[in-house]
UniProtKB/Swiss-Prot annotation:
The record marks R56, R127 as: Interaction with phosphoserine on interacting protein. GO terms for molecular function: histone deacetylase binding; identical protein binding; phosphoserine residue binding; protein domain specific binding; protein kinase inhibitor activity; protein phosphatase inhibitor activity; protein sequestering activity. It comes from Gallus gallus. CDD domains: 14-3-3_beta_zeta (cd10022). Its main location: cytoplasm. Homodimer, and heterodimer with other family members. Phosphorylated. One of its GO terms (cellular component) is cytosol. This is 14-3-3 protein beta/alpha. The gene is YWHAB. One of its GO terms (biological process) is negative regulation of G protein-coupled receptor signaling pathway.
Length: 244
């Protein structure tokens, strides 16, 4: 199948909400080794975000059930085995994406915007691995996630407007990483607040085509700040952080 047919297949799969098919088509496009267009890049990102998102959600549900069945050994064992099955699927998906990023996408990126997009993605997928990892493995995935986010962050500050949706989305996810993975609420809040304030100060640089995306992410940054501030004051809140 040539590239245009694979892209068309990915679009059909998206309409049908068959994200595994969508991811497979965009993986094949990526493996052809050309730099992806913005549209192709977004198709790849949406496909894998849905594929991995389903497993992350399942993992949380089963982990919660497992904790509630501590008194029943048989039920707990079943819960643990099922969680491990979901974990293996999640790890395979993340490793697939990370291989595409390292082998094709980051090295082929010619524009700073693309480089930031892919490094953010690398940070995200190592973060997803960190959520289910333990011991030395967790230390490695956490360090890899932070390194990718930090590199993306440095480039975005140098090369992109504070209102750019990719720069804002990176700040959003990097702050979630600090809050959820590193348990550093102060750093998370500082990062999110700085990104929000810098974007507000330059609202006049917002272009029409990205206005909706940028303002949505700014809203998520503000929502997270509100949630995190209330949690740190001792309120019991639902830790449903917004991510991009």
């Amino acid at each position: 199948m040539d590239k245009s047919e694979l892209v068309q297949k990915a679009k059909l799969a998206e309409q049908a909400e068959r994200y595994d098919d969508m991811a497979a088509a965009m993986k094949a496009v990526t493996e052809q080794g050309h730099e992806l267009s913005n549209e192709e890049r977004n198709l790849l990102s949406v496909a894998y975000k849905n594929v991995v998102g389903a497993r992350r959600s399942s993992w949380r549900v089963i982990s919660s059930i497992e904790q509630k069945t501590e008194r029943n050994e048989k039920k707990q064992q079943m819960g643990r085995e099922y969680r491990e099955k979901i974990e293996a699927e999640l790890q395979d998906i993340c490793n697939d994406v990370l291989e595409l990023l390292d082998k094709y996408l980051i090295v082929n990126a010619t524009q700073p915007e693309s480089k930031v997009f892919y490094l953010k993605m690398k940070g995200d997928y190592y973060r997803y691995l960190s959520e289910v990892a333990s011991g030395d493995n967790k230390q490695t995935t956490v360090a890899n996630s932070q390194q990718a986010y930090q590199e993306a962050f440095e480039i975005s500050k140098k090369e992109m407007q504070p209102t750019h949706p990719i720069r804002l989305g990176l700040a959003l996810n990097f702050s979630v990483f600090y809050y959820e993975i590193l348990n550093s609420p102060e750093k998370a809040c500082n990062l999110a607040k700085t990104a929000f304030d810098e974007a507000i100060a330059e609202l006049d640089t917002l272009n029409e085509e990205s206005y909706k995306d940028s303002t949505l992410i700014m809203q998520l940054l503000r929502d997270n700040l509100t949630l995190w501030t209330s949690e740190n004051q001792g309120d019991e809140g639902d830790a449903g952080e917004g991510e991009n």
